[in-house]
């Protein structure tokens, strides 16, 4: 191998090394930007979740107040029994609700609209 061939190979390797280095530098910049954006999105996501939780709590409190105010005294008593963990529906009346699971029949008794037949 001649000295000029060896020199040309060395120049080629140097150019490839520069291209590789430039590629790595570009990837590093892109990765840094992506990580920064990810951190910003995580913070924004956290704030949005907190805000959503506040809105849900406010809505639940408002709904509970509205429902309680719109119920007759007897329905409010049934609602209190239901909230204490007892069935108030005709199918399971008086039995305890397991794990305080909701009962569609009980909810229908409390909140369902009755029509006079």
From Swiss-Prot:
Alphabetic keyword roster: Cytoplasm, DNA replication, DNA replication inhibitor, Metal-binding, Zinc
Subcellular location: Cytoplasm, Nucleoid
Gene Ontology annotations of biological process type: DNA replication
Aminoacyl-tRNA synthetase found in the keyword field: no
Disulphide-bonded residues: none
GO-annotated cellular components: nucleoid
Cofactor: Zn(2+)
Record note on cofactor: Binds 1 zinc ion per subunit.
Domain of life: Bacteria
Main location: cytoplasm
Binding site for Zn(2+): 87, 89, 103, 106
Record bears the keyword Cell membrane: no
UniProt record similarity statement: Belongs to the YabA family.
Binding partners and assembly: Homotetramer. Interacts with both DnaA and DnaN, acting as a bridge between these two proteins.
Role played: Involved in control of chromosome replication initiation. Inhibits the cooperative binding of DnaA to the oriC region, thus negatively regulating initiation of chromosome replication. Inhibits the ability of DnaA-ATP to form a helix on DNA; does not disassemble preformed DnaA-DNA helices. Decreases the residence time of DnaA on the chromosome at its binding sites (oriC, replication forks and promoter-binding sites). Tethers DnaA to the replication machinery via the DNA polymerase beta sliding clamp subunit (dnaN).
Stated name of the protein: Replication initiation control protein YabA
Organism phylogeny: Bacteria, Bacillati, Bacillota, Bacilli, Lactobacillales
Gene name of this polypeptide: yabA
């Amino acid at each position: 191998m001649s000295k000029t061939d060896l020199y040309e190979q060395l120049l080629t390797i140097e150019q490839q090394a520069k291209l590789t280095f430039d590629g790595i530098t570009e990837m590093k910049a892109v990765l840094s930007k992506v990580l920064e954006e990810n951190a910003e999105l995580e913070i924004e996501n956290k704030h949005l979740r907190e805000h959503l939780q506040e809105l849900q709590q406010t809505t639940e409190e408002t709904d509970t107040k509205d429902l309680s105010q719109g119920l007759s005294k007897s329905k409010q008593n049934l609602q209190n029994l239901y909230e204490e963990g007892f069935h108030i529906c005709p199918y399971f009346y008086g039995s305890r609700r397991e794990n305080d699971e909701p009962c569609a029949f009980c909810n229908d008794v409390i909140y369902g609209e009755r029509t006079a037949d």
